[in-house]
Amino acid sequence: MKSSLLVVLTAGLAVRDAIAHAIFQQLWVDGVDYGSTCNRLPTSNSPVTNVGSRDVVCNAGTRGVSGKCPVKAGGTVTVEMHQQPGDRSCKSEAIGGAHWGPVQIYLSKVSDASTADGSSGGWFKIFSDAWSKKSGGRVGDDDNWGTRDLNACCGRMDVLIPKDLPSGDYLLRAEALALHTAGQSGGAQFYISCYQITVSGGGSANYATVKFPGAYRASDPGIQINIHAVVSNYVAPGPAVVAGGVTKQAGSGCIGCESTCKVGSSPSAVAPGGKPASGGSDGNAPEVAEPSGGEGSPSAPGACEVAAYGQCGGDQYSGCTQCASGYTCKAVSPPYYSQCAPTS
């Protein structure tokens, strides 16, 4: 009887933990909603736990997509996380289950963001929202954390792009580290997605870089830590944030797009690859078309195309629904998420 009860309890905890898993899915650029058009969406909402594996770069099973989101140096992108694919509701926590830990953003300059695998180039950190002591808190669980800020801001986190960042293609690596089981080696959970962006109007900064895998070790104090005890100090893993980047104080509240952006304000005439629908080919970063119908209104079906494997439908989704040639919008996790899959 006891063994049966243990099995039931273990299964219940596993289900609860799985439900609490999450994915960085959408990207906003200066308040414009690009949905998942330039995101290498992970195949599931499960975490990466082996920091020495290839999966720590951009998550398991991901590959390049055709879409690239245009970003201006000095501008702001907003990464967006939710537990289930395609669910952008603020009713549920972005990442549940008391998955407290830091949120960090890295960039890697590449020749072509749609094909680079992220393992050959160097990475540098441009943003960190890690930890701060909460007055009256007893243990680390009670403190302020980056993932707690994600929950408070409907899964959104504003990230400033350094104004002196050189122009060109980049992979933007968004990482949320959950520390609820990190008291033992291999217990930390990394939730990672890579976005493909093209930066324009940049400068000439030259940043020191690290490589993934290699930048983290399972025994790093920011990775192996018991947050169910008193936490007197916490330093997030990896290098320091580069000059021109941002270190946000955990618990400082929602700002900018985190609190004001409305789902559905997506570009109405940006084709896959981030090029203007008019077909401009001068090599410069594209201009972003004004959202159709005003702020908060969805793009009209057919007004823009969704890149291969990008989101094209689902509960609360109001972006583009027409897939690129050779792809059809198919339900992957109904009713939450549909994506453009090869037409069979």
Curated annotation (Swiss-Prot):
Organism: Neurospora crassa (strain ATCC 24698 / 74-OR23-1A / CBS 708.71 / DSM 1257 / FGSC 987)
Residues spanning the signal sequence: 1-20
Cofactor: Cu(2+)
Known uses: Lignocellulose is the most abundant polymeric composite on Earth and is a recalcitrant but promising renewable substrate for industrial biotechnology applications. Together with cellobiose dehydrogenases (CDHs) an enzymatic system capable of oxidative cellulose cleavage is formed, which increases the efficiency of cellulases and put LPMOs at focus of biofuel research.
Name of a matching Pfam family: CBM_1
Cofactor: how bound: Binds 1 copper ion per subunit.
Residues given in the record as Cu(2+) binding sites: 21, 99, 191
Cellular component annotations (GO), alphabetically ordered: extracellular region
Catalysed conversion reaction: [(1->4)-beta-D-glucosyl]n+m + reduced acceptor + O2 = 4-dehydro-beta-D-glucosyl-[(1->4)-beta-D-glucosyl]n-1 + [(1->4)-beta-D-glucosyl]m + acceptor + H2O
Domain notes: Has a modular structure: an endo-beta-1,4-glucanase catalytic module at the N-terminus, a linker rich in serines and threonines, and a C-terminal carbohydrate-binding module (CBM). The CBM domain is essential for binding to and subsequent oxidative degradation of polysaccharide substrate.
Residues that, per the record, bind O2: 180, 189
Protein name: AA9 family lytic polysaccharide monooxygenase J
Family per similarity comment: Belongs to the polysaccharide monooxygenase AA9 family.
Subcellular location: Secreted
GO molecular function: cellulose binding; metal ion binding; monooxygenase activity
GO BP annotations listed: cellulose catabolic process
Compositionally biased tracts (Low complexity): 285-301
Gene name of this polypeptide: gh61-10
